[in-house]
A protein has these predicted regions:
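Low-complexity, intrinsically disordered short peptide segments enriched in small/polar/basic residues
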Residues: 6-9, 14, 45, 59, ...
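Short S/T/G/P-rich N-terminal loop/turn motif that feeds into the first structured element of a domain
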Residues: 16-80, 89-96, 122-126
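Hydrophobic alpha-helical segments, especially transmembrane helices
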Residues: 3-4, 30, 95, 104
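Alpha-helix boundary/capping residues
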Residues: 11, 52, 69, 101, ...
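Bacterial Sec-dependent N-terminal signal peptides
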Residues: 1-23
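Surface-exposed, polar helix/loop patches in the mature regions of secreted/periplasmic/lumenal proteins
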Residues: 83-126
């Protein structure tokens, strides 16, 4: 019985250590896509783009930031035109970002411009 318990402990410990190593080899991508209400002027859109870009300098949990405008010839973007990608080291960092005062201030800048918003998070290997 003691050997069985010891074996189970070693097996669980090994699995836990490997899971932690795998998490350290990954980065969390947080993708936000916006579509705009008809008639939204470029000044309002530029204000959102600028405010989103400033978050990287205000919230140190953000490891990388990039953005772009849709140029896919497939016409499958469903009205979403602007795509922003933030990179985090962990889900905990992403979660802290979501409640960060600077992120909340950014969300206030959004109103009332976007018509559509989609958010997708996923893990990638480093």
């Amino acid at each position: 019985m003691k050997k069985l318990l010891l074996f189970a402990f070693i097996l669980i410990s090994s699995y836990t250590m490997n899971a932690q190593k795998d998490e350290q080899k990954q980065l969390l991508k947080h993708v936000v896509m916006f579509g705009w209400k008809p008639g939204t002027d470029t000044v309002a859109i530029d204000k959102v783009v600028s405010a989103f870009g400033n978050l990287e300098h205000k919230i140190k949990l953000i490891k990388a930031y990039e953005w772009g405008i849709n140029n896919s010839p497939e016409n499958l973007n469903n009205g979403l035109t602007h795509c922003f990608t933030l990179t985090f080291s962990s889900e905990a960092d992403r979660d802290a970002y979501l409640i960060h005062p600077d992120h909340k201030a950014f969300v206030a800048v959004l109103s009332p411009a976007p018509d559509k918003v989609t958010v997708v998070d996923y893990w990638v290997s480093k």
